[in-house]
Amino acid sequence: MWCIVLFSLLAWVYAEPTMYGEILSPNYPQAYPSEVEKSWDIEVPEGYGIHLYFTHLDIELSENCAYDSVQIISGDTEEGRLCGQRSSNNPHSPIVEEFQVPYNKLQVIFKSDFSNEERFTGFAAYYVATDINECTDFVDVPCSHFCNNFIGGYFCSCPPEYFLHDDMKNCGVNCSGDVFTALIGEIASPNYPKPYPENSRCEYQIRLEKGFQVVVTLRREDFDVEAADSAGNCLDSLVFVAGDRQFGPYCGHGFPGPLNIETKSNALDIIFQTDLTGQKKGWKLRYHGDPMPCPKEDTPNSVWEPAKAKYVFRDVVQITCLDGFEVVEGRVGATSFYSTCQSNGKWSNSKLKCQPVDCGIPESIENGKVEDPESTLFGSVIRYTCEEPYYYMENGGGGEYHCAGNGSWVNEVLGPELPKCVPVCGVPREPFEEKQRIIGGSDADIKNFPWQVFFDNPWAGGALINEYWVLTAAHVVEGNREPTMYVGSTSVQTSRLAKSKMLTPEHVFIHPGWKLLEVPEGRTNFDNDIALVRLKDPVKMGPTVSPICLPGTSSDYNLMDGDLGLISGWGRTEKRDRAVRLKAARLPVAPLRKCKEVKVEKPTADAEAYVFTPNMICAGGEKGMDSCKGDSGGAFAVQDPNDKTKFYAAGLVSWGPQCGTYGLYTRVKNYVDWIMKTMQENSTPRED
């Protein structure tokens, strides 16, 4: 039994809508019971309406049918509520009440309260499916353009050039899909200047060659689109989309946006969307492709060539750094680079910048220093100084350098050439003073004669004239081209010499006018008795070691009789063949004949055989002070006539007829040209 009931229910649930039917109140035609509520759901096939009519109506009457009633509902709308008794007004029709609804569903609900004072028989009603005109029977028009009715339904259609949307009700214009690739063109809304279609979405695409941007131009009078609502929202709208940039939406009478739109893109989508209403003429625009502009970037510290007010796609500029600036990436030392305006509106090589030239850490110099710079960039200033008081800056310029635009440290006088610190010559740290009479001279300190060089073999002297050269007599080195030499020591004791500076000779240069003899001991001609020793390593100057000056070539350096000069050395004294401590004496210049008149001590030849020339200076003769054997090669130091703080080597101890009288000295002034030439030609180490 339950299976039969379930089957019946399922059959009712899934029953097809019927074209007609009957509805009777409970127990009809007998009196309906109290406290009853029953409903009937009526459904006819889609496309039909329902005609519901009553042939009998006998329900307890009450105000607003509050007690008993039959209610007719269509959707959420109550079509009617009935009670009381009704009779037909048409003798030819049994219908006492009827309802016509354009929908295919209807609900009928019957209610009775708890008591009835009289006997009421209820109602008898019938329904039939009726054809409806969807095109006219509804408040809302089902079709946007043409509505076509048929029995059981309707269909929509569109005028030419329109199409029916997927909802089968609304018509639209097929206005999408157009792609514009020409560099210039015109686009308008459908039917322009006639009213554009409603309920449409038109999409236009502009696709230009990369490197060109789309520029849209409109006139205000060419734009008439349905205005915005009260909230400011466009009902119909025109929108421009270029990449991630959007212009619009625009609507209203007269174009409200900029009349010239630069999109910065070669691709532009134009979207025109309309709603269901509106009768406006639409819009018309023009577009053209403008070469993509590149910004005129203000690259600091540079000049752009060529200079233009505007740069566009494919333009090439040369960016040249200002003086003192360079490109920090790319080629080393580059001062300019090229940049091209690219299709994306950006410059190539945009990462390259002009930054201050860096001159780097300045080079160090011998015998001097440079202060640590706060900066090494263009415009920075450094200063070189020499190790005073033993060195001075020979080539001028003041030692101040600035970081120049070419990346070099430059001096106003020397340019990029580094300053040269050379030894200060002829200035003893402690001037010589004759403190105590010694036979033939006085004790001296090496600080009185810092140029004094001691030759160990043979026992002799020399004069330091710069950091690489020693001046001495030719006869000192003619027999030993690799002499052992020392500087910086007052005493020549072995223990003291070990603490002094030993000089290593590289090459000996004897004046070409010096005559070499097989037996030097019998020499009677000491003309051109001068030689130079090139040292292997430079001598570091200090309080006990510094050179003596060379004489100038002007007449100021011509010695006069009576001019005083200083001699120093470790030569023979009255008591000893060799001195251990440095001795010195002050001697006057004497006429050359004074030396000629002195009888030669232990002559090896006739007195007339000894040669006296203008290349020799005669000095001494007073109080027994004179140079002697062992002093050879030492300087005869005379105060500089143009700078009283300095001494120059006026002569070199050469020979003498007799110790303690007059001595002969090589006149150095006559050999300055040879000295300078020899040193210049041999300024670099010799390759023997």
Swiss-Prot record:
Enzyme class: hydrolase
Biological process per Gene Ontology, one example term: innate immune response
EC number from the UniProt entry: 3.4.21.42
Residue numbers binding Ca(2+) 2: D131, I132, E134, N149, F150, G153
Signal peptide: 1-15
Glycosylation-annotated residues: N174, N406
Presence of the UniProt keyword Metal-binding in the record: yes
Residues with PTM (3R)-3-hydroxyasparagine: N149
Alphabetical keyword list: Calcium, Complement pathway, Disease variant, Disulfide bond, EGF-like domain, Ehlers-Danlos syndrome, Glycoprotein, Hydrolase, Hydroxylation, Immunity, Innate immunity, Metal-binding, Protease, Repeat, Secreted, Serine protease, Signal, Sushi
Subcellular location: Secreted; Cell surface
Xref: InterPro entries: CUB_dom, EGF-like_Ca-bd_dom, EGF-type_Asp/Asn_hydroxyl_site, EGF_Ca-bd_CS, Pept_S1A_C1r/C1S/mannan-bd, Peptidase_S1_PA, Peptidase_S1_PA_chymotrypsin, Peptidase_S1A
GO cellular component: blood microparticle; extracellular region; extracellular space
Record PTM text: Cleaved and activated by C1R to generate Complement C1s subcomponent heavy and light chains.
Disease: Complement component C1s deficiency: A rare defect resulting in C1 deficiency and impaired activation of the complement classical pathway. C1 deficiency generally leads to severe immune complex disease with features of systemic lupus erythematosus and glomerulonephritis. Ehlers-Danlos syndrome, periodontal type, 2: A form of Ehlers-Danlos syndrome, a connective tissue disorder characterized by hyperextensible skin, atrophic cutaneous scars due to tissue fragility and joint hyperlaxity. EDSPD2 is characterized by the association of typical features of Ehlers-Danlos syndrome with gingival recession and severe early-onset periodontal disease, leading to premature loss of permanent teeth. EDSPD2 transmission pattern is consistent with autosomal dominant inheritance.
Family membership: Belongs to the peptidase S1 family.
Subunit structure, as described in the record: Core component of the complement C1 complex, a calcium-dependent complex composed of 1 molecule of the C1Q subcomplex, 2 molecules of C1R and 2 molecules of C1S. The C1Q subcomplex is composed 18 subunits: 3 chains of C1QA, C1QB, and C1QC trimerize to form 6 collagen-like triple helices connected to six globular ligand-recognition modules.
Name of the protein: Complement C1s subcomponent
